[in-house]
């Protein structure tokens, strides 16, 4: 029987915000992943990084203030750092859960770059929330540095561009590991946004919506299923439709962005 190929997208609620929360959250997420593996599925996991990448960016900027020999870390570098440490916790949690069930299967994390279009309108209209809630004073300081900030119910948040993913650079590596029977963690936080420039890939000052990258990955891998684990109560039709309609039963069809 052909094994089902499933792309699982973990939202930020499945990862927590602080390091202790993340340690506990990935153990819960690992049980879900292990259930799929035990049922005979080949699994690729993507995950959010919205709180983490913003906090890394802020921490690196503050470190740069204290140590002037160090420059501020670009957003693309912060995305790479978040992929690494979230992948580390998630990979070990999945490995341990599989071993507890007597399943001997390698889990690997792939540092993943995702190409974006430099002319994407998102670069002129940043909307993606990152990092923790800021005070008014902190928000003013961020704006003085040229960063975008928006007011929320709880205070203020940094916002950055969120261009659409165009291509997944490491898709062949992901496919090879999946075909070899490994559990693969890839495109954390939507992947590291990069712009192709001749032979090189340059990091973009942006983050990518992980659900869009997950959809692209499912398409490129010819996956049987895309599973998005989220904390929202239910799925609704587009917010711009009139009226918005809540979906309460399974629907087979296309999801467009």
Regions picked out by a protein language model, each given a short descriptive name:
Residues 24-32, 74-92, 97-100, 161-178, ...:
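Polyanion-binding loop/helix "lid" in catalytic or ligand-binding cores
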Residues 224-229, 233-242:
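Conserved phosphate-donor
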Residues 63-184:
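Ligand-binding beta-strand-loop-alpha-helix segment within the catalytic cores
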Residues 55-68, 242-252:
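Short, flexible, mixed-charge acidic loops at enzyme active sites
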Residues 22-27, 59-70, 124-132, 199-206:
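A glycine- and small-aliphatic-rich helix-loop capping segment at beta-alpha/alpha-beta transitions
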Residues 7-9, 42-55, 106-111, 184-187, ...:
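Short beta-strand segments at enzyme active-site cores
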Residues 14-16, 50-54, 116-119, 192-194, ...:
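Short, active-site-adjacent cap segments at secondary-structure transitions
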Residues 1-49, 55-65, 176-181:
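N-terminal glycine-/serine-/threonine-rich phosphate-binding loop
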């Amino acid at each position: 029987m052909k094994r089902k190929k499933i792309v699982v997208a973990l939202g930020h609620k499945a990862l927590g915000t602080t390091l202790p929360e993340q340690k506990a959250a990935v153990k819960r997420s690992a049980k879900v992943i292990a259930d799929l593996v035990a049922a005979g599925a080949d699994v690729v996991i993507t995950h959010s990084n919205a709180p983490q990448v913003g906090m890394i960016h802020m921490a690196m900027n503050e470190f740069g203030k204290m140590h002037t020999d160090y420059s501020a870390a670009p957003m693309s570098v912060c995305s790479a750092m978040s992929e690494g440490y979230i992948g580390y916790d998630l990979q070990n949690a999945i490995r341990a859960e599989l071993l507890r069930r007597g399943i001997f299967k390698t889990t690997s994390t792939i540092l993943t770059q995702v190409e974006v279009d430099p002319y994407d309108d998102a670069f002129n209209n940043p909307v993606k929330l990152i990092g923790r809630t800021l005070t008014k004073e902190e928000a003013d300081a961020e704006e003085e540095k040229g960063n975008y900030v928006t007011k929320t119910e709880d205070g203020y948040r940094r916002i950055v561009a969120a261009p659409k993913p165009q291509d997944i650079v490491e898709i062949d590596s992901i496919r090879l590991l999946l075909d070899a029977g490994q559990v693969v963690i890839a495109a954390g936080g939507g992947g590291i946004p990069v712009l192709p420039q001749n032979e090189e890939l340059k990091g973009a000052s942006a983050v990518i919506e992980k659900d869009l990258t997950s959809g692209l990955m499912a398409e490129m891998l010819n996956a049987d299923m895309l599973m998005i684990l989220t904390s929202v109560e239910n799925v609704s039709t587009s917010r711009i439709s009139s009226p918005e309609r809540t979906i309460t039963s399974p629907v087979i069809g296309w999801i467009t962005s």
